[in-house]
């Protein structure tokens, strides 16, 4: 049987967008290596509603 891969898809959600109370959410999908980064990741991504780069955190 084949082994389960280490690379998984994760969803990143904007933290600043939630605080503003505006409609909708800013989410991005990316991949991470489970073996190298077991903790949740934070990346700066572009939020089209706020029109600026914001911190996006991994959600489960």
UniProtKB/Swiss-Prot annotation:
Keyword Ribosomal protein listed: yes
GO biological process: translation
Pfam families: Ribosomal_L33
Keyword GTP-binding in record: no
Highest taxon above the source species: Bacteria
Keywords per UniProt: Ribonucleoprotein, Ribosomal protein
GO molecular function, one term: structural constituent of ribosome
InterPro entries in the cross-refs: Ribosomal_bL33, Ribosomal_bL33_sf, Ribosomal_zn-bd
GO cellular component, one term: ribonucleoprotein complex
Family (UniProt): Belongs to the bacterial ribosomal protein bL33 family.
PANTHER family from the UniProt entry: 50S RIBOSOMAL PROTEIN L33, CHLOROPLASTIC, LARGE RIBOSOMAL SUBUNIT PROTEIN BL33C
Protein name stated in the entry: Large ribosomal subunit protein bL33
């Amino acid at each position: 049987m084949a082994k389960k891969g280490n690379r998984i898809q994760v969803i990143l959600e904007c933290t600043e967008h939630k605080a503003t109370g505006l409609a909708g959410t800013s989410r991005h999908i990316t991949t991470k290596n489970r073996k190298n980064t077991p903790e949740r990741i934070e990346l700066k991504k572009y939020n089209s509603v706020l029109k600026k780069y914001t911190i996006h955190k991994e959600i489960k």
